[in-house]
Amino acid sequence: MIPKEEIMGIFEKYNKDEVTIVTVGSHTSLHILKGAKLEGFSTAVITTRDRDIPYKRFGVADKFIYVDKFSDISKEEIQQQLRDMNAIIVPHGSFIAYCGLDNVEDTFKVPMFGNRAILRWEAERDLEGQLLGGSGLRIPKKYGGPDDIDGPVMVKFPGARGGRGYFPCSTVEEFWRKIGEFKAKGILTEDDVKKAHIEEYVVGANYCIHYFYSPLKDQVELMGIDRRYESSIDGLVRVPAKDQLELSIDPSYVITGNFPVVIRESLLPQVFDMGDKLATKAKELVKPGMLGPFCLQSLCNENLELVVFEMSARVDGGTNTFMNGSPYSCLYTGEPLSMGQRIAKEIKLALELKMIDKVIS
């Protein structure tokens, strides 16, 4: 892990009046960049030439850093270009996937918003389970391997893969059949199979809950809630049951979009309690904790119990559903507030208070 002192040494050489907020052109970059501009920051996007159109058309980026391929963002010349523009990187799922988690931890020497040490805790299922379970949150039962399957389960794989390759099954035979099909299609590798995470299939309504922990205020804020459009499952459920049986199609769970929702108000105490518990446990296990945005992906069962099946330890894709604010985020200020602008507000306040060390790593 890059020492915090080294990152702070880099930041001390910056022109503090000309800080640029930078992210990779993908995932949640539109509201990250727009939010930064609304708070008066210069912005830059890292992109390839065939993917720069949204950032030009929407006018969210002041500067463009072009790479031949997104994995080039870890190259030293790109890092130096970022340092020269006094950059603070805002990481999201695509940034981590393209840069590589090992590079983020050990070689990417550019100041980054949030706690870069916690990113591995969302990527590795055992660490994620340790954090979620240690927080006292209700999580699905975990199975040690396919031979332990004794009922409906969901099979997942590590990393930010947008649900690609996930599948449900009920028997060990079905597990290996589907593994074989996905390997044949090139969706899964043998290494993926070795890291398969098998958990209880929880029946319930899906809620992805987006929080922001402010280290400057020591407070967890509820920013918004969304649900996902997943292919092919959301298309299959529109097919009559008798026709589904004739089609014999195994559903997939690839995230293709998101839509905003509100949760019944009587569940909000449970929602806040979950966020508070996770933030508290994160301070203990991965100091300095869960800085900035995080997400708990949950299912609400018929007993109105929220079961957390996954977390994001950085800005989650579902925050795109409230680029102009959510029914919850607007309650804090009375004005529209995206997650991107909330991040920029925290950076701006940290600079004003000379407490930037509290929000970057």
Swiss-Prot record:
Keywords: ATP-binding, Ligase, Magnesium, Manganese, Metal-binding, Nucleotide-binding, Purine biosynthesis. InterPro entries: ATP_grasp_subdomain_1, IMP_biosynth_PurP, IMP_biosynth_PurP_C, IMP_biosynth_PurP_N, PreATP-grasp_dom_sf. It holds the Pfam family DUF1297. Mg(2+) binds at Q297, E310. GO terms for biological process: 'de novo' IMP biosynthetic process. Binds 1 Mg(2+) or Mn(2+) ion per subunit. It catalyses: 5-amino-1-(5-phospho-beta-D-ribosyl)imidazole-4-carboxamide + formate + ATP = 5-formamido-1-(5-phospho-D-ribosyl)imidazole-4-carboxamide + ADP + phosphate. This is 5-formaminoimidazole-4-carboxamide-1-(beta)-D-ribofuranosyl 5'-monophosphate synthetase. The lineage of its organism: Archaea, Methanobacteriati, Methanobacteriota, Methanomada group, Methanococci.
